[in-house]
Amino acid sequence: MGLCCSCLRGESSLEDSTGLPIAENEREAVTSLLEFLENKDQYDFYSGKPLRALTTLVYSDNLNLQRSAALAFAEITEKYVSPVSRDVLEPILMLLTNPDPQIRIASCAALGNLAVNNENKLLIVEMGGLEPLIEQMKSDNVEVQCNAVGCITNLATQDDNKIEIAQSGALVPLTKLARSSNIRVQRNATGALLNMTHSGENRKELVDAGAVPVLVSLLSSMDADVQYYCTTALSNIAVDESNRRYLSKHAPKLVTKLVSLMNSTSPRVKCQATLALRNLASDTNYQLEIVRAGGLPDLVQLIQSDSLPLVLASVACIRNISIHPLNEGLIVDAGFLPPLVKLLDYQESEEIQCHAVSTLRNLAASSEKNRAEFFQSGVIEKFKQLALTCPISVQSEISACFAILALSDNTKYDLLQQDVLKVLIPMTMSQDQEISGNSAAAVANLISRVSNLEKILEYWGQPNDGIKGFLIRFLSSDFPTYEHIALWTILQLFECHNETIYKLIKEDQKLVNGVKKIADENYAVAREYMQDGQDTNIDHNGNSNNIEGNGRSNKQSSEKEDASFELYNITQQIIQFLV
């Protein structure tokens, strides 16, 4: 260690301006330390004689010896990082309070080096290291500031330390140093602020400390690292609803700057800017503002990127933006449909597929014009190809999209002609209740008020026992929601007034018995329910008077009673067709 050794060599160099004599034990420590430093790979400086020699110099009254100890600690810790004891940290923390700036620079560096190790991070904070580090951040010396902030940055990567740091008073000086004209100080400060954004409590502390205006202003920095730290910090801050409200009121230029950063030459800045917009777009006002700020052209380019992180960030962002009905047509007009359909084949990421399907689902519920383009994009055929083989999460989104599309009388015929029943019927057998429920609802919606029953009859018995099999399974499920879907579907089939359908249902004993079983199971509850209402009488033969206009009991009915009555009500309407 050239610098340290030079500080130790020579009698004259050991004298300081005070003219204090060097004690014998200090002279011996210098001699020993010179030997240790010349052969440092052979010694452990964190215990035994090397540590005692360093400690002796730290507690010397001789300024040069103190400097030598600080410089030695800085070099040793840079090369050798391992868990250390209190005996190592105590002299370094002592040096942090030294009035000499060179000593504070070196001791901050040493502490920052040791703070790479997780055990050391905890011990430094436990031993009260934050207070002297905060004082060093307030120094007028840029090097002291830089090393102190660098140490805080390392300490803040340990979760257990973050609350301590947030409550120590460190956030205000960190925020101030984020405006430093020195780029190294600025990088360290913004990096430390970023490390403090990984929990809701700490994010609130940051907002309260006034960090948001600083972070937003630094989005315009020419330094890619500073841009990245600030963009990521703001993205994390935007996770919380209360913070989004704060940003909406106090950061009016935020969206414009983030949209601009989607064109950054730095891939990670571009990605984080998109993620920040995604988080902001959890709120309705931001969904509109991002579009007004010109975000769609950039997003449609990014979802076609070769970078998986960029594709994921951008498709997640457009998914949130597509939630707002006023954005649906603009998204379609911006050319999103073809690349979104292409993303359905993105086998490398289930999450990307999910966001793509979810976005398409939102767009499917828009205007007739957009719905026409939706069908022309080939998305239905792609859904059919994926539906039975894709991951559960993707299948769930596809089933939800089919359920929404099937609600529209204008799209039912197209869906039936594209043979969606071929995949919807097997999906009703899924062990996932959301998938089976959505798929069954889609089948029921397709059947409701349909004039051409050709496809209904074609898929009555196949695949997987067809529509008939789905109805039998749901009638015997003992799950009220499934029973309701099956009963409602049967009622819709009867209301088509098709003799072939009548015959298929009436002659199938499993279907008939399933309906009667549900009627029997819910008769007692329904009768009590109606007696409480006093307006309607029901007999067990299925005759009812003014069922839809029944009175309600003054006491609140339970959800279970409501469900039982509704099930019984539908069974009675079906039984009228069966008799």
Curated annotation (Swiss-Prot):
Lipidation (S-palmitoyl cysteine): 4-5, 7
Family annotation (Gene3D superfamilies): Leucine-rich Repeat Variant
Molecular function, one GO term: protein-membrane adaptor activity
A Pfam family of this chain: Arm
Primary location recorded for the protein, binned into one broad class: membrane
Lipid attachment points (N-myristoyl glycine): 2
Subcellular location: Vacuole membrane
Keyword Repeat on entry: yes
Residue stretches of each ARM repeat: 39-76, 77-116, 118-157, 159-198, 200-239, 241-282, 284-323, 325-365, 409-448
GO-annotated cellular components: fungal-type vacuole membrane
Top-level taxonomic group: Eukaryota
Region (Disordered): 534-560
Membrane topology summary: Lipid-anchor
InterPro entries per record: ARM-like, ARM-type_fold, Armadillo, Vac8
Biased composition (Polar residues): 534-556
Keywords attached to this entry: Lipoprotein, Membrane, Myristate, Palmitate, Repeat, Vacuole
SMART domains noted in UniProt: ARM (SM00185)
Biological process annotations from GO: autophagosome assembly; nucleus-vacuole junction assembly
Claim: Lipoprotein is one of the keywords in the record: yes
Protein role: Functions in both vacuole inheritance and protein targeting from the cytoplasm to vacuole.
Family: Belongs to the beta-catenin family.
The protein's name: Vacuolar protein 8
Species in which this protein is naturally found: Kluyveromyces lactis (strain ATCC 8585 / CBS 2359 / DSM 70799 / NBRC 1267 / NRRL Y-1140 / WM37) (Yeast)
